[in-house]
Amino acid sequence: MNDLELMHLALAEARRALEHDDVPIGAVAVVGGTVVGSAHNERELQSDPTAHAEVLALRAAARHLGRWRLQDATVYATVEPCPMCAGALVAARVFRVVYGAPDEKAGAAYSLYNILQDPRLNHECRLTTGVLA
């Protein structure tokens, strides 16, 4: 599958967040062309401020693969990751992050900060932006 097809999967995941009145953001984690984790925002559903789509997709991928280092993974997110999610993506050693829309209020991949490619951190993610934005 290509970036457009995988972002469509993330968008479908985002729509599921509307079922429980959450912000419609979706994320899909892929390794070797196979989806290993997908999620949507569940902050309202779980009453959990950390239940962002990217974090939940990383957790699902780590469980599926049986490891926390996701150095061969690409994560597709419908919106630019926030500081918490960007930090989680770096901590998981994600190889590449692809996102759709920028987030001028909380974007931590380009708009406000560049956590994903900060050379002071222990890992830098490759980045592709604006897919299906």
Predicted features and spans:
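A cytosolic small-molecule/anion-sensing beta-strand core signal
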Residues: 31-32, 59, 71
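Short beta->alpha transition motifs characteristic of CBS
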Residues: 36-43
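Short beta-strand scaffold segments in enzyme catalytic cores
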Residues: 25-33
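Short, basic and Ser/Thr-rich N-terminal targeting/leader segments
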Residues: 21-25, 71
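Immediate flanking context of iron-sulfur cluster ligation sites
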Residues: 67-79
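Zinc-dependent deaminase
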Residues: 1-17, 32, 81-84, 88-133
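Small-residue (primarily alanine) positions within well-ordered alpha-helices
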Residues: 10, 14-17, 27, 37, ...
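A short, polar/charged loop-to-alpha-helix boundary motif
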Residues: 45-56
